């Protein structure tokens, strides 16, 4: 079976956590069908902290690190755009997966859309209705460059509808006929995963001998 290659772009630490849920699902259920390439832009990157994040979340370290670091919005976005374009040309993924509303999000959306690679936006449709916020510009622009939009809330669906997105899919998904899906919050998947992990690994009840008699917290 030929694997489809997707390229996931992350930059901020919250994006690592969100991307982990999808990465684990791919590894567990779709490893023969999907190859995931992980790119860290370096927007928020500390070698020690990030290494702990990836280890604790149970996902591999990034295949690429652009090491962009901090700077102005324009400087960071331009550096990411240049680095991502080179990686996309090399890897030629079937799709690029982005999360949220950071500079990494908008840079990846721009890089992919301009060379006609479909963009998959997870956490699409969210709005603060304050365009003075850089994140609001990022999330609006990213949505309008995406082919598949995965929306966590019903309010997000309403926001996209007001911006002209169609909810009835009559054609194959493409950038000028995107498909919108109400999928729920990906952080809930992480909550379920770590709740189960905690139940399996925690020994605090035994260590404190709380299993000897009933107790109340």
List each language-model region with its residue ranges:
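Solvent-exposed, flexible loop/coil residues
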Residues: 20-21, 49, 53, 58-63, ...
């Amino acid at each position: 079976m030929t694997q489809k290659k997707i390229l996931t772009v992350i930059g901020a630490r919250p994006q690592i956590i969100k991307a982990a849920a999808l990465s684990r699902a791919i590894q567990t259920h779709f490893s023969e069908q999907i190859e995931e390439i992980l790119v860290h832009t370096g927007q928020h990157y500390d070698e020690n902290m990030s290494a702990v994040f990836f280890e604790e979340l149970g996902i591999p370290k990034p295949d690429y690190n652009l090491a962009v670091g901090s700077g102005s919005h324009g400087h960071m976005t331009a550096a990411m755009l240049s680095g991502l374009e080179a990686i996309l040309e090399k890897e030629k993924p079937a799709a690029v997966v982005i999360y949220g509303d950071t500079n990494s999000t908008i840079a990846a959306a721009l890089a992919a859309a301009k060379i006609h690679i479909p963009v998959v936006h997870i956490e699409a449709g969210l709005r603060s209705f304050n365009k003075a916020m850089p994140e609001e510009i990022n999330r609006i622009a990213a949505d309008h460059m995406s082919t598949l939009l995965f929306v966590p809330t019903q309010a997000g669906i309403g926001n996209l509808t007001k911006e002209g997105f169609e909810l009835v899919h009559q054609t194959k998904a493409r950038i000028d006929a995107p498909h919108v899906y109400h999928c729920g919050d990906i952080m809930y998947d992480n909550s379920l995963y770590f709740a189960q992990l905690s139940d399996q690994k925690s020994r605090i009840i035994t260590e404190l001998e709380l299993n000897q008699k009933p107790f109340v917290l």
